[in-house]
Amino acid sequence: MGGEQEEERFDGMLLAMAQQHEGGVQELVNTFFSFLRRKTDFFIGGEEGMAEKLITQTFSHHNQLAQKTRREKRARQEAERREKAERAARLAKEAKSETSGPQIKELTDEEAERLQLEIDQKKDAENHEAQLKNGSLDSPGKQDTEEDEEEDEKDKGKLKPNLGNGADLPNYRWTQTLSELDLAVPFCVNFRLKGKDMVVDIQRRHLRVGLKGQPAIIDGELYNEVKVEESSWLIEDGKVVTVHLEKINKMEWWSRLVSSDPEINTKKINPENSKLSDLDSETRSMVEKMMYDQRQKSMGLPTSDEQKKQEILKKFMDQHPEMDFSKAKFN
């Protein structure tokens, strides 16, 4: 039978026809067979039973395709569910270890590398400060430092993101990627939590988490809208409630979970921790461009758009050597 493009050839016409059948698929099928009966010799033109055989074969073919599609969809959903459960369990384990007091923690290679980078940056900052006191740095360096301090003035007081690009707060911990957010809320109770003990209400722009009969741990307006039907929550180890939220806008970092939370400095977020591989190619290229432009701006270098303009200008100047651009001003 025909390929996908051939199958979709009459979709517009059939969809318009289907929308005029208030009785649904049954009425649409009846109209189709009525057309075959009245306008063709489908039922009487061939041998006995040929029409019925053709209908049965066609139904069997498309039924197999439909069942295959449904199985593949279920497999994808199950894989996503397992991934979310594993992520929630990992988050709950981290939250539980943090509430159980100081412990020796073995760092992963990535965490160790990031920690070493922070130590090196701190040493560089100390050396820089010492050089400033000794007067060994020239005035342009001092001017750059003052400009950086002025630029970051509005970010003073904001929290530094945790390793998951979220925040570690007194009563809960949250992490995020561009497309989703995970939250772990540990409860200090002397019994194993069950679903009936909890009040978890996920709405498009509001979240509430707490114990029944107790003041809610979280009860506020979310930073932005979430897909309620794709969000979920569960209880880990009988002590920690984990919540998974799917963002509607997958092109932004949240600076807080709910409006009552302190803000994190989204400029210090590490984009590499997010799952760019989960995004479609178009969205991924846009995000990578945003990340590149952000890095360029932080270093005082031209963005990708500015680089393109410079290349076009340079090409034009090369093609017109007779023109004098020395006194020209470019924006």
Swiss-Prot record:
Phosphoserine sites (modified residues): S60, S136, S139, S259, S260, S274, S277, S285, S298, S326
Sites of Phosphothreonine modification: T108, T145
CDD domains documented for this protein: p23_mNUDC_like (cd06492)
Domain called CS: residue spans: 167-258
Region called Interaction with EML4, residue ranges: 173-331
Induction: Up-regulated in actively dividing hematopoietic precursor cells. Up-regulated in cultured erythroleukemia TF-1 cells by granulocyte-macrophage colony-stimulating factor. Strongly down-regulated during maturation of erythroid precursor cells.
Primary location class: cytoplasm
Subcellular compartments: Cytoplasm, Cytoskeleton; Nucleus; Cytoplasm, Cytoskeleton, Spindle; Midbody
Chain intervals for the UniProt region annotation (Disordered): 62-108, 129-170
The keyword Cell cycle belongs to this UniProt entry's keyword annotation: yes
Superkingdom of the organism of origin: Eukaryota
Residue ranges annotated as motif Nuclear localization signal: 68-74
Tissue specificity statement from the Swiss-Prot or TrEMBL entry: Ubiquitous. Highly expressed in fetal liver, kidney, lung and brain. Highly expressed in adult pancreas, kidney, skeletal muscle, liver, lung, placenta, prostate, brain and heart.
Family, similarity comment: Belongs to the nudC family.
Protein name: Nuclear migration protein nudC
